[in-house]
Amino acid sequence: ILGDILNYGPRNSIPEGIDAKGIVEALNKRANDIIAVRGNCDAEVDQMLLKFPMMGDYTLLVDEDRKLFLTHGHIYNKEKMPQGHVDAIVYGHTHLWELSQQDGTLVCNLGSITFPKGGNVPTFMTYEHGVFTAYTLDGKALKQERI
C-alpha cells in the first residue's frame, strides 16, 4: 500500500460511503501480508490503529535480482529519484497513472482507484515476474512494461 491509507488529507472532505473504521478492520485482518509506506496524508494516529508498519517513507523490495523502490511519491518520484540504481520506482501520489522508462529505471505511477485525476479512469497495477501491467477497474489492460 503506497500511502494515504485512511484519509485524503485535511483539505479534502471524506467522500460519502468511505468507511475508515471498516478499512482498518479489513486491512488488519491481512496485516501479515501487507507492505505499506507513509503518504503525505498519513499520520501517527493512523499507525496507532493499524497492525502493520506504515510510517516509512519508502521500502526497497527485491525480487530475484530486481530492485523495486516503493514510495508514496511526495518525496521520491520521477523528478526526484532515489540515490543508487533501482530497476523500478513505484508510487502514486499524483493520481495520474504512468508506465515509462527513465534512464534505465521503470517509472510506475499506479494512478488511483478512488480519486483518479487528469480525466483518467480509475486504475491499478499488478506486478509479476518483472512485469508491471496497468488496468482499468473492469480489467482492461492499458499498458505493460518489463523491468
Give the ranges of each region predicted by the language model.
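Core catalytic region of metal-dependent phosphoesterases/phosphodiesterases
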Residues: I1-D63
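Conserved beta-sheet core of the metallophosphoesterase superfamily
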Residues: G56, K67-F69, H74-E145
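Alpha-helical context
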Residues: G3-D4, V37-G39, D103, G111, ...
